[in-house]
């Protein structure tokens, strides 16, 4: 995540409001920080945060404008697996709470099946839709889904399609 190193967490989250000339409302910043579990870190600086916390600040910064569409391009790719699993669960909780559309780009078959209700697989250049999958999963999802036979079957199905796309290129 790209954060302003000289700015506090709250100042980083406030940035989109300033850029869009939206009247500053402290309550919106605090609400976004609370949503991502960082309400107590508003006065911290990025250098004082873990990688997962920095990612949460970036998510709060995106949420402060109350978007109807959230675009996320590999936001968890550089994180360790434990942090990634936690943020996956947090993202699902936010999605349910905010009721907004999330377009999530990932290179992880496992992450795509866990997070998605629908998966679009693209070909390499030029990018075209190569396959589409509807993910059948219980709602709300829980960590136990990752160890279920249904999850394993869907991961195998998506992996097989990925292997076919790779063989064609």
Report each predicted region and the residues it spans.
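ABC-type ATPase nucleotide-binding domains, specifically the catalytic core motifs of the NBD
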Residues: 4-26, 35
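Hydrophobic anchor residue at the start of the ABC signature
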Residues: 59
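Helical segment within the ABC ATPase nucleotide-binding domain
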Residues: 84-98
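Conserved H-loop
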Residues: 100-105
